[in-house]
């Protein structure tokens, strides 16, 4: 037993051989040896299994014995308690007394005391009844009872159970009326499952062999020692009751199983999850999430939809954070406050030392001091001329790079000594004093020295200058920054603070310090990237798309529990800021992730360049109601002269051409399509003013569409406080009146018995003309399925089918809302209208005239001339006309 387990563990620790790695054939001796090994292993497995079964049976026997003894103890205790209770068994005594009271009443009473009651009807008065009774003594009593006639009440109409739906649902695949429908045969008295097609008959599936644990050991041992050739498969078939193909498939499964176990032996579940990319982790969510309804497991559009990604992504940028508050203890804004205090103390220390210095560097220090005094002291950046001038040179380089213009020859020295690996972050909202620029223009040599200054403090602060913007970690003092850098000549020698402020070092020292600082920056960047997993990087990129360069929101919403705000800001500074300003040359230390993030940056820059290409301003396209789509086609559809076309989003990039799915189907591109907003086939909404969205002047209303707040300019959905960027609420309480279906602003509908037929729908509150009452919901079925169900509904003299578009029909028989009970009338007070709401066709019921409270709702089903049932035809129809009515599907049509 121990030897077999050790062998199994040794074989599982080794890398299993693939089936194609084994030899093509085996000699006779090898096959005989394999046969013997498998036979011995089979006996070991059988003996081990037998021992395990015996052990389990013994354990179950002991557990059953303990449980049975406990039940006996409980029963004995209950019996003792019942015997010791007062009054004996109350239940038995009560049953006996009841029997004597009701059954033995004659024996308890005397034979002459028995009373008999006789009911005798006499024709005294209509509606009266005489009751006579006699006792044992011979006395008789007569009582006259007057009957009360109950009024006749109509029978309650039959009611069918239905499921309430507040939104349309697509029919499930197994809900067809022709599949597995149960009929009861009165002749043979049995229920039969009848199907309209032979395809529904399930075919017998081949039984697959279920491998046991012992068979897995045999297969794994044979494949590890001898490969998986044809001869080995034939030998395995003698010990395993399976086909060679099944054994081969099982070997592949075992190989993957043990391979994953060997890989996961040194990794936790969290590490394995973080190593996956976001696409792999969200694979099931992508299939279940509906991007049109924004819900999971959508019943309307179904799962596994075609993913359509928009060609234009929302531009993102860095938000100003002067007025922001720290999001927590690990927020980069808190480190920014500490950084400001440290820099102010260091600046004061450098100023005090320069005033006492007698060296030739006093002039340079005085220049630095005078320039720092002219700068704004309220700014939260560095107050050093070296930092300002270096940043100024970077701003100049970035401007020349953006404009594709070569800088002047005189400025070449300014950018010559700037390290190319340093992040090219500009001081966007910082001001440079005019006095500093003038003084530096007169002394180019001094400016050159300042640029090439080897101050570790200046270089480290330059690397941290973006802390107010992105929160990079900075040392607490100048000494800590010096300690982090390696020494120049002596390993034990450190640079003093005075030397840093005076700037008295040689050119060799300058180059060495600059190289060391660059190496430190690169090492920090490599260290930052190495601690970010693939999933965390993908979440970071997704956060850049959603929230922009806001580390607080990214860390709080997408990287909660994984990364802090400080880590996100540091990662953004090391990877995102440098790539946004300069292209990556070759294979950088960022690898493929840097290329992916650079793609996001370039896509954003390209999108902005196209808009601001002419004269630096975005041109506003002027649209009128005539350019809102296809007015001619929509007008015919609105008048009911043409079928509505089902909308399916297209996946076109940029502009749509002739191959666009929307163009081929004759529909407009919507916001769910992948094409750009400037697509000529896109419906651009309306620009209506007050009270125009419910008139034919509105392009949305004219095209039988509801206004979309994402597309229409003046149609907003909010509380009106301006929190979403919309205009403030108007004083007259104006709201777009063409979004009733979208916002579900329906009226209260009551259900009651109708005076026409069956149940009816009633309005609770009075409504005015053209007011929205509610939505007619149900199952979305095909026209072929509607023909099948229509035949059954015609026999039941009911109609719940509603034509929606050329692809779907609404069926409210089993699923729907209360408006399904609204009856037909040739003179109705309501009308039905098909509206396109967020890309989906929906049926709305509107008031045709003013309707008072508690009135029943009627609308014209608009049956065809030969499809109306008898109860829906006009009164002047004769019996001959009724007999000639065809039994085709009776369907409702909206106007």
Curated annotation (Swiss-Prot):
It is an enzyme of class 2 (transferase). It is found in: Nucleus. Residues 1-13 have a biased composition (Low complexity). GO terms for molecular function: chromatin binding; histone H3K27 methyltransferase activity; histone H3K27 trimethyltransferase activity; single-stranded RNA binding. Residues 873-885 have a biased composition (Basic and acidic residues). InterPro entries: CXC_dom, EZH1/2-like, Hist-Lys_N-MeTrfase_plant, Pre-SET_CXC, SANT/Myb, SET_dom, SET_dom_sf, Tesmin/TSO1-like_CXC. Widely expressed. Expressed in leaves and stems. Expressed a low levels in roots, anthers, ovaries and ovules. It catalyses: L-lysyl(27)-[histone H3] + 3 S-adenosyl-L-methionine = N(6),N(6),N(6)-trimethyl-L-lysyl(27)-[histone H3] + 3 S-adenosyl-L-homocysteine + 3 H(+). It holds the Pfam family SET. Its EC number is 2.1.1.356. Residues 1-28, 369-425, 485-508, 867-895 are annotated as: Disordered. SUPFAM superfamilies: SET domain (SSF82199). Residues 747-862 form the SET domain. Its main location: nucleus. Residues 383-399 have a biased composition (Polar residues). Keywords: Chromatin regulator, Developmental protein, Differentiation, Flowering, Methyltransferase, Nucleus, S-adenosyl-L-methionine, Transcription, Transcription regulation, Transferase. GO terms for cellular component: chromatin silencing complex; nucleus; PcG protein complex. Residues 628-732 form the CXC domain. SMART domains: CXC, SET. GO terms for biological process: callus formation; cell differentiation; flower development; heterochromatin formation; methylation; regulation of leaf senescence; regulation of short-day photoperiodism, flowering; response to abscisic acid. It comes from the Eukaryota. Down-regulation of EZ1 delays flowering in short day (SD), but has no effect in long day (LD). Interacts with FIE1. Interacts with FIE2. Component of the polycomb repressive complex 2 (PRC2), composed of the core PRC2 components FIE2, EMF2B and CLF. PRC2 methylates 'Lys-27' residues of histone H3 (H3K27me3), leading to transcriptional repression of the affected target gene. Belongs to the class V-like SAM-binding methyltransferase superfamily. Histone-lysine methyltransferase family. EZ subfamily. This is Histone-lysine N-methyltransferase EZ1. The gene is EZ1.
């Amino acid at each position: 037993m121990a030897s077999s387990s050790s062998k199994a563990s040794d074989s599982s620790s080794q890398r299993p051989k693939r089936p194609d790695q084994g030899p093509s054939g085996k000699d006779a001796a090898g096959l005989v040896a394999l046969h013997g090994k498998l036979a011995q292993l089979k006996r070991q497995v059988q003996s081990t299994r037998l021992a395990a079964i015996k052990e389990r049976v013994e354990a179950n026997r002991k557990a059953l014995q303990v449980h049975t003894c406990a039940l006996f103890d409980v029963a004995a205790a209950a019996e003792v308690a019942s015997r010791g209770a007062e009054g004996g068994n109350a239940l038995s005594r009560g049953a006996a007394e009841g029997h004597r009271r009701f059954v033995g009443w004659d024996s308890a009473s005397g034979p002459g005391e028995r009373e008999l009651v006789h009911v005798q009807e006499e024709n005294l008065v209509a509606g009266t009844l005489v009751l006579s009774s006699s006792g044992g003594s011979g006395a008789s009593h007569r009582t006259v009872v007057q009957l009360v006639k109950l009024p006749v009440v109509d029978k309650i109409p039959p009611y069918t159970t239905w499921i309430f739906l507040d939104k349309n649902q697509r029919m499930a695949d197994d809900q067809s009326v022709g599949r597995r429908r149960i009929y009861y045969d009165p002749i043979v008295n049995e229920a039969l499952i009848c199907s309209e097609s032979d395809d529904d008959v399930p075919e017998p599936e081949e039984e697959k062999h279920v491998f046991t644990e012992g068979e897995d050991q045999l297969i794994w041992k044979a494949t590890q020692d001898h490969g998986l050739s044809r001869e080995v498969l034939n030998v395995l078939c003698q010990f395993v009751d399976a086909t060679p193909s099944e054994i081969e498939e099982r070997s592949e499964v075992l190989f993957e199983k043990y391979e994953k176990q060997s890989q996961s032996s040194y990794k936790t579940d969290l590490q394995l999850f973080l190593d996956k990319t976001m696409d792999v982790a969200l694979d099931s969510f992508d299939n279940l999430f509906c991007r049109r309804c924004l819900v999971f497991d959508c019943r309307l559009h179904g799962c596994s939809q075609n993913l359509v990604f928009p060609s234009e992504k929302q531009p993102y940028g860095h938000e100003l954070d002067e007025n922001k508050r720290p999001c927590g203890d690990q927020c980069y804004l808190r480190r920014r406050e500490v950084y400001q205090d440290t820099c102010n103390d260091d600046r004061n220390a450098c100023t005090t030392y320069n005033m006492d210095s007698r060296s030739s560097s006093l002039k340079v220090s005085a220049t630095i001091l005078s320039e720092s005094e002219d700068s704004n002291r309220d700014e939260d950046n560095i107050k050093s001329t070296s930092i300002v001038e270096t940043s100024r040179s970077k701003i100049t380089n970035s401007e020349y790079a953006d404009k594709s213009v070569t800088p002047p020859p005189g400025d070449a020295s300014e950018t010559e000594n700037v390290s190319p690996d340093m992040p090219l972050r500009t001081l966007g909202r910082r001001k440079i004093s005019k006095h500093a620029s003038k003084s530096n223009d007169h002394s180019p040599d001094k400016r050159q020295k300042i640029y090439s200054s080897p101050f570790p403090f200046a270089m480290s602060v330059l690397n941290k200058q973006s802390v107010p913007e992105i929160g990079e970690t900075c040392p607490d003092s100048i000494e800590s920054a010096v300690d982090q850098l390696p020494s120049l000549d002596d390993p034990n020698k450190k640079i003093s603070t005075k030397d840093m402020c005076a700037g008295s070092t040689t050119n060799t020292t300058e180059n060495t310090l600059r190289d060391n600082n660059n190496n430190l920056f690169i090492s920090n960047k490599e260290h930052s990237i190495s601690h970010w997993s693939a999933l965390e990087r993908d979440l970071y990129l997704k956060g850049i798309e959603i929230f922009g360069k806001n580390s607080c929101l990214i860390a709080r919403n997408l990287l909660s529990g994984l990364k802090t705000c400080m880590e996100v800001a540091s990662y953004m500074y090391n990877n995102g800021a440098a790539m946004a300003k300069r292209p990556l040359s070759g294979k950088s230390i960022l690898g493929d992730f840097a290329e992916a993030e650079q793609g996001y940056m370039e896509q954003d820059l390209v999108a902005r360049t196209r808009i601001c290409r002419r004269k630096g301003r975005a041109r506003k396209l002027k649209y009128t109601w005539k350019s809102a789509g296809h007015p001619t086609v929509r007008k015919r559809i609105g008048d009911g002269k043409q079928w509505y076309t089902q909308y399916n989003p297209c996946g076109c990039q940029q502009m749509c051409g002739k191959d666009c799915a929307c163009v081929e189907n004759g529909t407009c591109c919507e916001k769910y399509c992948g094409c750009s907003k400037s697509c000529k086939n896109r419906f651009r909404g309306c620009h209506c003013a007050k009270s125009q969205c419910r008139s034919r002047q509105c392009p949305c209303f004219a095209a039988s569409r509801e206004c979309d707040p994402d597309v229409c300019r003046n149609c907003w959905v909010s509380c009106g406080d301006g929190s979403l960027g919309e205009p403030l609420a108007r004083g007259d309480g104006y709201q777009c009146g063409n979004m009733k279906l979208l916002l579900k602003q329906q009226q209260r509908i009551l259900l009651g018995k109708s005076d026409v037929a069956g149940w009816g729908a009633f309005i609770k509150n009075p409504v005015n003309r053209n007011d929205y009452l509610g939505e007619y919901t149900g199952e979305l079925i095909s026209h072929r399925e509607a023909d099948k169900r229509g035949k059954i509904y015609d026999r039941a003299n009911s109609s719940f089918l509603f034509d929606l578009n050329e692809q779907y029909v609404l069926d409210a028989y089993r699923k729907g809302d209360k408006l399904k009970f609204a009856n037909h009338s040739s003179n109705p007070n309501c009308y039905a209208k098909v509206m396109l709401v967020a890309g989906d066709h929906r049926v709305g019921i509107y008031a045709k005239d003013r309707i008072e409270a508690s009135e029943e709702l009627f609308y014209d089903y608009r049956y065809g001339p030969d499809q109306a049932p008898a109860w829906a035809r006009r009164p002047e129809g004769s019996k001959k006309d009724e007999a000639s009515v065809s039994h085709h599907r009776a369907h409702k049509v909206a106007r």
